[in-house]
A protein has these predicted regions:
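Positively charged n-region of N-terminal signal peptides that target proteins for export
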Residues: 1-5, 15, 24
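Short hydrophobic targeting helices and cationic amphipathic motifs
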Residues: 7-10
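Bacterial N-terminal signal peptides
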Residues: 20-36
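Small beta-barrel nucleic-acid-binding modules, primarily SNase/OB-fold domains
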Residues: 2-3, 17, 36-280
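A ubiquitous, low-specificity "background" feature that marks scattered single residues
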Residues: 12-15, 30, 71
Length: 280
């Protein structure tokens, strides 16, 4: 570590060391003020420091993870997936979808000024704007949903905060909070996977019993009969689970289920799809 004394001894002097630091602070403060945004406590937002790209006005709450803005844009919350409401046929809505929407409505109201922070990809395939959403009080809406069990963590793109979102989801699952109290959403044991799960996105729980390298994949084998395929080209991103200390550990894997060569399997593309249960 370079101390202020060392800087002074080197001839730079503390005056010159502090000057650029203070200037950078002032520039940062000025950029926030130019957006009219107040800084929220970092204690409130566990995952993402409060910062924003744009101020917007809320017009409508569509469901637990989608909002409509006054300017007509649809906002899809990055990194979470709440139960879907079928607006055309309400009876087909997913379990706990109305509760998730009601929770968002308890945090926001029409006309509220919100702050958005955009991810690396601006739009999803449906033309919705992808964003982290901060309430008027500076709270991250995604974090609130995950903590209370009104949404699950789900990564569709490069998401720098996925590990924090995964921890929040795991805590909610452990407490059977919100949607996690229902079998519809709870991770399924490998022994109960059946035809009804084919080609559906599921959470599957099992114990790592072996590893296997075959073809283009490294296979994580759960309970001796369920295979999780990790592309060898991207295996470096999965170092936490591709380790000997993962053997005999319980994991939860999420993804679309396939049945091939008489084996149930999930092919993963992002490390967020595999989580160690009760990590040390």
């Amino acid at each position: 570590m370079i101390s202020q004394r060392n800087l002074t001894d080197s001839g730079l002097g503390s005056r010159f060391w502090l000057g650029p630091y203070l200037m950078n602070c002032l520039l940062l403060l000025g950029s926030l003020l130019s957006l009219g945004l107040a800084q929220a406590s970092t204690d409130d937002n566990l995952c993402i420091p409060y910062t924003a790209s744009e101020k917007v006005t809320l017009a409508h709450i569509n469901d637990g993870d989608t909002l409509t803005l006054k300017d007509g844009r649809l906002i899809r919350l990055i990194g979470v997936n709440a139960p879907e409401i079928d607006h055309q046929y309400p009876s087909l809505s997913q379990r706990y979808s109305l509760e998730a929407r009601a929770f968002v409505a308890s945090k926001l109201k029409v006309g509220d000024e919100l702050a958005l922070m955009f991810g690396p990809t601006k739009l999803d395939p449906y033309g919705r704007t992808l964003a982290y959403v901060f309430t008027a009080d500076g709270l991250l809406l995604q974090q609130e949903l995950l903590q209370q069990g009104f949404a699950m963590a789900r990564v569709y793109q490069e998401h720098p905060f996925w590990e924090c979102f995964a921890r929040l989801e795991q805590q909610a699952r452990t407490q059977n909070a919100g949607l996690w109290q229902f079998d519809d959403y709870a991770p399924r044991a490998t022994s109960v996977i059946g035809q009804q799960d084919l080609n559906h996105y599921r959470l599957v729980r099992g114990v790592v019993t072996d590893f296997e390298r075959k073809g283009q994949y490294l296979w994580l084998i759960l309970d001796d009969n369920f295979y999780v395929g990790i592309p060898q080209a991207g295996s470096g991103n999965f170092s936490k689970v591709l380790a000997l200390n993962s053997l005999k550990r319980a994991v939860v894997v999420r993804g679309k289920l396939y049945f091939s060569y008489k084996k149930w399997q999930i092919i993963v593309s992002h490390p967020s799809q595999i989580s160690l249960e009760n990590p040390p």
